[in-house]
């Protein structure tokens, strides 16, 4: 589904991402982990064609993302608050997304229903603009907006940030569910190793822009190796 070949990004003479070859199959749930500056967000931005690669390419379903816009019709993503439209209410924002993806109002209501617990009655019906919500609720709105389009490909950058523990557990379950039930290809970056290990089928460890480990994660098997790399002592 996603193919990366000789992908390189350079900022001010410094190579911040350099991945020779990476293939992600349809239906995989891939966790990106690494310390700050490892290149996780840069990789996601390149997959979404938000920044230009200095070398190499990214393909989605066989087409280069910088040469075709077909992938946009089946891709959902949330990187940060700049993806939101601050002067809209949540209802208006989700309706806007529905218009972009051809989702009618009734279908949109059905797709929002599984997120009711996640929203904690703090988002819909509040008559607030997105700019007036807390960081946590803005994060929720952005994630929901990416998922309600029922994408074939879903990319989320640090989806557990700003969320309370119950919301973190809730969204982890929903991400795993969408992958399992719809065969969605999911790529998430996170510093939360436990959640990544709990839901990911595969974990990619980046260091200074390079892919240094590609770990299969059957039954959470990768967590021990990740803990060793990050210097986390087992209890």
Question: Where in the sequence are the language-model features?
Answer:
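Catalytic Walker B motif of ABC-type/P-loop ATPase nucleotide-binding domains
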Residues: 154-158
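Conserved structural motif at the start of ABC-family nucleotide-binding domains
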Residues: 2, 17-19
């Amino acid at each position: 589904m996603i193919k990366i070949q000789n992908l390189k990004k350079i900022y001010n003479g410094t190579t911040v991402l350099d991945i020779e070859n990476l293939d992600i199959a349809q239906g995989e749930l891939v966790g990106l982990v690494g310390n700050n500056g490892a290149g996780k967000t840069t990789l996601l931005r390149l997959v979404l064609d938000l920044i230009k690669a200095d070398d190499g390419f990214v393909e989605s379903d066989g087409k280069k993302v910088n040469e075709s816009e077909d992938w946009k019709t089946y891709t959902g993503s949330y990187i940060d608050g700049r993806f939101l439209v601050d002067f809209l209410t949540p209802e208006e924002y989700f309706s806007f997304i529905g218009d972009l993806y051809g989702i009618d109002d009734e279908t949109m209501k059905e797709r929002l229903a599984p997120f009711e617990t996640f929203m904690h009655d703090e988002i819909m019906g509040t008559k607030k603009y997105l700019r007036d919500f807390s960081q946590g609720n803005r994060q929720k709105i952005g994630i929901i907006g990416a998922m309600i389009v029922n994408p074939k490909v879903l990319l989320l950058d640090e989806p557990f940030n700003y969320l309370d523990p119950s919301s973190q557990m809730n969204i982890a379950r929903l991400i795993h569910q969408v992958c399992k039930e719809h065969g969605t290809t999911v790529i998430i970056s996170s510093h939360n190793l436990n959640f990544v290990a709990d839901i990911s089928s595969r974990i990619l460890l980046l260091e200074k822009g390079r892919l240094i480990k590609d770990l299969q994660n059957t039954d959470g098997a990768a967590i021990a190796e990740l803990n060793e790399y990050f210097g986390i002592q087992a209890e």
